[in-house]
Curated annotation (Swiss-Prot):
HAMAP family: UPF0210 (MF_01221). Disulfide bonds: none annotated. Belongs to the UPF0210 family. Homodimer. This is UPF0210 protein CPF_1748. It comes from Clostridium perfringens (strain ATCC 13124 / DSM 756 / JCM 1290 / NCIMB 6125 / NCTC 8237 / Type A). Transmembrane segments: none annotated. The lineage of its organism: Bacteria, Bacillati, Bacillota, Clostridia, Eubacteriales. InterPro entries: UPF0210 (IPR007841).
């Protein structure tokens, strides 16, 4: 039987602590759309998305009304387009990106992901076409998101892809306002197939025809819970986070199952990730400071983040029948009011953020850098982050934005959930010769598990 204090606690979480479901994401296979004619393929993709997802937004809104749970985004992820379009006789996949954009707008979702390629061991002709299509595709669409997987623990790092993605990010930044196209482009190592979060979501080839995946949020709830155990031992801190994570994830499980039932689409996973927003009271950085840090980014931050990330997973695992996606704590600089502030104050640097990515979900996320940064430096940042993922057998990623005509200390405004970001310093050295070597960095010895 529900107790009054539990009901009041839930209401407080939603009304005062910014508890929400960050996204309901429909994963959709486009394998049956394959066609040699890119125009026909684009039409098939549009038709399948609009037919399958026609009730996605309404379903989310109905669940919001029924349970009183805010659902911030409704999204779609599709099979990596480099696979779907492999038989096309064309030089660019811009028409496909436009069809995805049009279909997503037609059904009313916030973003659609899957304009993607998996090149961790090498390129197919289709992979190269897609990557070369990225700048113009991101410049000519509004809500299409893209990702490229350039490495894995099993196969090493494709350094040719790392070099190419540095050049692609640089080019994209030059043809989109304030480099905004780069905010819709993620470079992965060890990408997962069931990620509900953008911009890195795609529907993996091992997935079902269609699934419902849900991503939860709630850093504000965790911070409020930690306020009750100030000065207590780390054991109590971990226990508090675990109990809170259970409650947050349980809500995500409820929404996922309900959406699955209403749409008659199988339930996939709940992603346990704590995802911040620029709103005050919805910050992962403030959770870390609540543990006893004067500033997020000071010494001790990596340890605090490791504790948070692990406790969130342990608590959430019991609350859902299927946990997947990225499942950890996100540290997107422009989307977290605390991290924005501490970046301005000099406590958070790219080097410190890189250390933090060793122990949390994903990687260097929504970081703005000077527009004059070279393509090889961007490739070097990608290579460093991919190495962390490869060696530690975890997902890492880079979503970095070179902002034209901006330099260290300037501010760029992206708006909405993407927030704003100070332009951060990159190393003045260069890695041109290193990046130009080409080939693959071999997989680590512990990849040989058979």
């Amino acid at each position: 039987m529900l107790k009054n204090n539990e009901i009041l606690e839930t209401i407080s979480m939603i009304k005062e602590q910014n508890l929400d479901v960050r996204t309901i994401t429909l994963g959709l296979s486009l394998m049956d759309c394959a066609c040699e004619d890119v125009k026909v393929l684009s039409e098939k993709i549009y038709d399948k998305i609009t037919k399958t997802a026609e009730n996605l937004v309404k379903t989310g809104e109905d669940i919001e009304k029924r349970f009183g749970i805010p659902i911030i985004n409704k999204r779609i992820s599709v099979t990596p387009i480099s696979i779907v379009a492999a038989s096309c006789n064309c030089n660019s996949y811009l028409d496909i990106a436009k069809a995805m954009d049009k279909a997503a707008k037609e059904v009313g979702v916030d973003f659609i992901g899957g304009f993607s390629a998996l090149v961790h061991k090498g390129f197919t002709n289709s992979d190269l076409k897609l990557i070369k299509s990225l700048p113009e595709s991101l410049a000519n669409t509004d809500i299409v998101c893209s990702s490229v997987n350039i490495g894995s623990t099993r196969y090493g790092i494709n350094m040719d892809a790392v070099k190419l993605m540095g050049e692609t990010i640089k080019e994209t930044s030059l043809i989109t306002p304030d480099g905004f196209g780069c905010a819709k482009l993620v470079v992965f190592c060890n990408a997962v197939e069931d990620n509900p979060f953008m911009a890195g979501a795609f529907h993996g080839v091992g997935e079902a025809e269609k699934v419902i995946n849900v991503g939860v949020s709630g850093p504000g709830v965790v911070k409020k819970a930690l306020e009750e155990v100030r000065g207590k031992s780390f054991e109590e801190v971990a226990e508090t986070i675990k109990k809170t994570s259970f409650k947050v994830t349980r809500m995500g499980q409820l929404v996922a199952k309900e959406a699955s039932k209403l749409m008659d689409i199988p339930f996939g996973i709940v992603d346990l990730s704590l995802a911040p927003t620029p709103a005050v009271g919805d910050s992962v950085g403030r959770v870390l400071e609540e543990m006893g840090l004067s500033n997020c980014g000071t010494h001790g931050t990596t340890a605090a983040l490791a504790l948070l990330n692990d406790a969130v997973k342990k608590g959430g695992l019991m609350a859902s029948s299927y946990v997947g996606g990225l499942s950890g704590a996100f540290i997107p600089v422009s989307e977290d009011e605390c991290m924005i502030e501490q970046s301005k104050n000099g406590f958070l640097t790219i080097e410190k953020l890189e250390a933090m990515t060793c122990v949390c979900s994903v990687g260097l996320d929504m970081i703005a850098i000077p527009g004059k940064t070279s393509a090889s430096t961007i490739s070097g940042i990608i290579a460093d982050e991919a190495a962390i993922g490869m060696i530690n057998n975890k997902t890492t990623a880079v979503r970095i934005i070179p902002v034209p005509n901006k330099d260290i200390g300037d501010i760029v405004e992206f708006g909405g959930l993407l927030g704003s970001a100070p332009i951060m310093r990159v190393s003045p050295g260069n890695c041109d010769d290193f990046i130009s070597r080409g080939g693959r960095i071999p997989a680590p010895v512990h990849s040989l598990k058979n």
